[in-house]
């Protein structure tokens, strides 16, 4: 999968890649795009699908070498594999019989225009393609466009091929001689802006296919937003095609320029990865572990000999934290360092083992909280883990990020006595971090397949529960990392990726399988899953699009949604540059 089948250059800086991607080839339509990631350090780069061969299971992409990522992609050869390829994305082009349609494209915009022109022609339209570039060397796909158009008009800035002039000159010539019912434009943003201004003078409905900055490309971060008719729209899910007369091109152009200096600097360094200011979370954790005294798992300890009053008198444990002077050295060092064995046992002594434990009622998954704490109190960490594992699939995650103060701990009897609640979250984390527990299925295999859409906390928890009941579970994830919001939405100083990965490996041990770069509803449909034998589908697609307030300035450069900021830092490693 994702193997480059063939590669050729149209010009010095424009390459065509044919890639093995059978699922995308099968589901792709004119106007769709994909997100490409060259390697584990690469950006997520949007590229419109220029062509697809369903029988061969391939898609065709045309790439112009502009920045670091596009240079990396163009440097690959046939036989190389892309780290990630996800799609099809965006809305397909609205194809129907309009009448006469002008397809105005510039530069590499000819590639995404090709399937659109072909589909329009097949729908019975008269298709006139205006193909523009600076010079003859940059004109691409002319013969292919001629095969699907009634007429191809070539425009070059220097007159080296076709007519001398801009794309707008050709568009106006067509409008002047005959009725034009629709115009579609694809190319550089500045070109599309002036095509829109030209067609607006003649009241010709015009669609522009926008290519904005993207981070995830699946509708989660909001980096691709544009203003259309005064409202914020997202290119990756609402587009990429919009009413060109309603697009705020000036704002879009400004947003496209915001990382120009950084890109130039990266190119001047030959695309080297910046590492002088950051280290990996694994390196940080390794350093911290070498400094800290890890809690030892000792044999069973004698039971607490005091009274209930003595238990209540024990003060709540304070979490050990990384020192500020160490904390400021990296975004990835976990601040809360966990409890020592002695601290955990002492805190467990505070539990009164209530006959009617309201803390269990406050827990969303009804963990037997007094039960696991009593095991921990006598030093039986494995026994405590087994009790937690009966109800919770992700104890190391939940012990860190669950809002215990609003759930289980909020129901603790200590609060009614004017004391601080038992630190249930701290204890759950301690058990999860220190017990090497192999979770096993509670049932024999039932021979039924279940699909889970999304690998965030809901998807992972559901997958674990179904696997325990004997179902064959597959989790489909749109991004290139398993974990969803646990990976991209929570900073590593609070929830390290290694903890999430450990929980995921536990699910794999249960038999759960994972497929990345698959968008259910795009790459695969529910009907496709049913045809493959899945008898149930659990949709855990996450929070979705960010919400903007519609106030002046929120689309200015360097204004980000929290989703975009966290995704850039957590998923794309932006903090290392």
Feature locations, PLM:
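FNR/FR-type flavoprotein reductase catalytic core
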Residues: 68-215
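A short, basic/flexible loop-to-alpha-helix module at the beginning of a structural domain
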Residues: 86-97, 432-450, 567-577
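Rossmann-like dinucleotide/flavin-binding elements
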Residues: 113, 119, 356, 452-476, ...
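Ferredoxin-type iron-sulfur electron-transfer modules and their immediate structural context
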Residues: 240, 248-284, 288-442, 449, ...
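Glycine-rich FAD pyrophosphate-binding loop
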Residues: 471-487
């Amino acid at each position: 999968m994702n193997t480059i089948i063939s590669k050729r250059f149209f010009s010095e800086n424009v390459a065509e890649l044919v890639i093995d991607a059978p699922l995308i080839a099968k589901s792709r339509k004119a106007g769709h795009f994909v997100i490409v990631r060259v390697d584990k350090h690469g950006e997520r780069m949007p590229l419109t699908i220029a062509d697809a061969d369903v029988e061969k299971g391939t898609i065709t992409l045309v790439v112009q070498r502009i920045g670091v990522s596009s240079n990396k992609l163009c440097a690959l050869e046939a036989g190389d594999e892309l780290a990630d390829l996800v799609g099809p994305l965006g809305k397909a082009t609205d194809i129907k019989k309009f009448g006469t349609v002008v397809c105005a494209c510039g530069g590499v915009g000819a590639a995404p225009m090709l399937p659109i022109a072909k589909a329009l022609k097949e729908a019975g339209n008269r298709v006139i393609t205006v193909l523009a570039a600076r010079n003859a060397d940059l004109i691409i796909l002319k013969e292919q466009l001629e095969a699907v158009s009634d007429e191809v008009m070539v425009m070059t800035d220097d007159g080296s091929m076709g007519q001398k002039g801009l794309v707008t000159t050709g568009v106006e010539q067509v409008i002047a001689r005959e009725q034009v019912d629709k115009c579609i434009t694809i190319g550089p943003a500045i070109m599309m802006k002036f095509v829109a201004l030209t067609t607006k003078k003649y009241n010709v409905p015009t669609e522009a296919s926008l290519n904005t900055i993207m981070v995830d490309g699946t509708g989660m971060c909001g980096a691709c937003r544009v203003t259309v008719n005064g409202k914020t729209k997202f290119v990756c899910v609402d587009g990429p095609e919009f009413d060109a007369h309603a697009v705020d091109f000036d704002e879009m152009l400004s947003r496209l320029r915001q990382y120009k200096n950084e890109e130039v600097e990266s190119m001047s360094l030959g695309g080297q990865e910046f590492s002088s200011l950051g280290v990996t979370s694994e390196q940080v954790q390794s350093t911290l572990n070498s400094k800290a005294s890890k809690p030892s798992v000792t044999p069973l300890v004698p039971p607490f000999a005091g009274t209930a009053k003595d238990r209540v008198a024990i003060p709540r444990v304070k979490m050990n934290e990384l020192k500020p002077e160490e904390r400021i050295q990296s975004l990835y060092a976990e601040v809360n360092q966990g409890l020592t064995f002695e601290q955990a046992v002492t805190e467990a002594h505070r539990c009164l083992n209530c006959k009617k434990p309201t803390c269990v009622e406050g827990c969303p998954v009804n963990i037997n909280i007094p039960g696991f704490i009593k095991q921990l109190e006598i030093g039986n960490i494995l026994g405590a883990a087994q009790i937690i594992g009966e109800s919770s699939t992700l104890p190391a995650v939940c012990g860190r990020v669950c809002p215990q103060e609003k759930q289980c701990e909020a129901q603790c009897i200590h609060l009614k006595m004017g004391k601080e609640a038992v630190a249930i979250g701290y204890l759950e984390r301690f058990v999860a971090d220190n017990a090497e527990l192999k979770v096993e299925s509670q049932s024999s295999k039932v021979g039924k397949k279940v699909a889970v859409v999304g690998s965030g906390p809901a998807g992972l928890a559901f997958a674990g529960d179904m696997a325990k009941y004997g179902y064959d579970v597959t989790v489909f994830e749109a991004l290139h990392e398993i974990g969803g919001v646990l990976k991209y939405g929570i900073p590593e100083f609070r929830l390290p990726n290694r903890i999430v990965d450990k929980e995921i490996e536990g699910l794999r041990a249960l038999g759960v399988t994972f497929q990345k770069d698959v968008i259910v509803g795009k790459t695969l449909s529910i009907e496709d899953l049913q045809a493959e034998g899945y008898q149930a589908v659990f949709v855990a697609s996450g929070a979705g699009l960010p919400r903007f307030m519609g106030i002046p300035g929120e689309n200015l450069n360097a204004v980000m949604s929290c989703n975009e900021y966290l995704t850039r830092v957590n998923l794309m490693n932006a903090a290392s540059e």
